[in-house]
């Protein structure tokens, strides 16, 4: 009988292990969809990813609008006259004092990249408008200069500068360094 008990014990152990393995696989199969549904989908990941913009077709004086993370961005190719005017502006007289050099990349003063939403209530300003030739918000009359600094109206702050970098002389990466 001893050999029969050993065989029965071995068979019983095997059934315990097999049942536990099937049970674990079943739990994993049921849990897997719940775990994966907590991950962001591909559209969400892509929406926050940096984007590269080819700026070679943007002529001097032109403003283009692109979208990053669902928000509009202005890219302005400033003229030498605009750069000179903005660098000479009295920073102390501004509503939100900020020098022109703090709003552009060193050596690339001809390119200005800012969010295209008025800092008052989020309307999209019109380019090459207003008393300073920058942007004019048609909703409540805020005016920005060619550096995106608020000059007049209810807007409390300058147009924000998004994180960006120059990949090369003809390409800007918006969202660089953002996780």
UniProtKB/Swiss-Prot annotation:
PROSITE patterns: RIESKE (PS51296), TAT (PS51318). InterPro entries: Rieske_2Fe-2S (IPR017941), Rieske_2Fe-2S_sf (IPR036922), Rieske_Fe-S_prot (IPR014349), Rieske_Fe-S_prot_C (IPR005805), TAT_signal (IPR006311), TAT_signal_bac_arc (IPR019546), Ubiq_cytC_Rdtase_Fe-S_su_TAT (IPR019470), Ubiquinol_cyt_c_Rdtase_Fe-S-su (IPR006317). SUPFAM superfamilies: ISP domain. GO terms for cellular component: plasma membrane. Its cofactor is [2Fe-2S] cluster. Keywords: 2Fe-2S, Cell membrane, Disulfide bond, Electron transport, Iron, Iron-sulfur, Membrane, Metal-binding, Translocase, Transmembrane, Transmembrane helix, Transport. This is Ubiquinol-cytochrome c reductase iron-sulfur subunit.
